[in-house]
Amino acid sequence: MQPDPAGFARLRAQLDLLADRPGVCFMPGAEYGPAKQWPIPSYGELGRRLVRQGFQVWVLGSAKDKPAGDEIATLAGEGAFNLCGRTELADAVDLLATARAAVTNDSGLMHVAAALGTPLVALYGSSTPHHTPPLSDAAQVIYLGLECSPCFKRTCPLGHTRCLTGIGVERVAEALAPALHATAPR
């Protein structure tokens, strides 16, 4: 997997991304199901904070993730871009390689970000980082390890998904902060 600097320049122009702000990737999807997805309003609130701090947010995912990406971009405000369904895997590689950091559910794109060495915060709900961790020293994992998790179910069998709703935006922001404020940009 090799990022293409020319590919990123093309994408920035094609997708109208901001040239003067570092990007942070959000990957809110998880093909397995909603029990692996951090709440959309939480992504939106985190995105709003990042935009206020001078970052732009790139929401990545498949066309199936477009509604979630729309909601996140709306909640985060100007400087957040829903790229779900608008990019190919090679484009996601270029965006992740250029991003200052990423916030992600346990998903395929999480593993792509880890392989690229992108600093990331990985959020685990119904799965466990003991089975499918991001293989990177630049990864921070947040996993509550509740009595009911990991359940490995697609939807929460108890109907509450506390394993994800219990992960607060502040906790994710704190885990993300060192990567955002690193002196050397990626």
Predicted regions and their residues:
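A short acidic, often aromatic-flanked loop/helix-cap motif at beta-alpha or helix-coil junctions
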Residues: 6, 88-91, 147-150
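Secondary-structure boundary motif
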Residues: 13, 17, 52, 74-78, ...
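Flexible, glycine-rich phosphate/dinucleotide-binding loops
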Residues: 33, 66, 89, 129-130, ...
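Donor-binding and catalytic core of enzymes assembling or modifying cell-surface/extracellular glycoconjugates
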Residues: 39-125
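Mid-sequence helix-capping/hinge segment at a functional interface
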Residues: 1-35, 40, 186
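Electropositive phosphate-/nucleotide-binding environments in soluble metabolic enzymes
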Residues: 5, 40, 66, 166-170
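Nucleotide-sugar donor-binding patch of glycosyltransferase catalytic domains
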Residues: 71-74, 82-83, 111-186
